[in-house]
């Protein structure tokens, strides 16, 4: 009887260890959302309006680092209009939390380029809220905040 309990205890502990290892691995959705964040950076850098249009929901709301509030149409226009030429946009330290058909992505970013002909280099944090509907993930809200240098 004692050996049965010992074997059961070993099995229980090893099962708990395996479950803990599995939960620390990113899910398929987490990896997909990280890829979408990278695709967003690439689309913004290359001023790809079609790609951005697919990534952003029609109800998209953006709060820029300076407090500017934009809807999807305004965000696309500001990204495509040419005032900002992003040479580089990189995300760092992203965390992804999936809640069924919704997800929140937090992280830091670094971007540099030209704005109205003047060089800039920014480091900030962002929060993006994504929803899954009609078979695809789309961002419904994004907010960025500059990190003081």
Question: Can you say where each PLM-predicted feature lies in the sequence?
Answer:
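Bacterial N-terminal signal peptides
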Residues: 6-16
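A beta-strand edge to alpha-helix "cap/lid" segment located at domain peripheries
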Residues: 4-5, 19-149
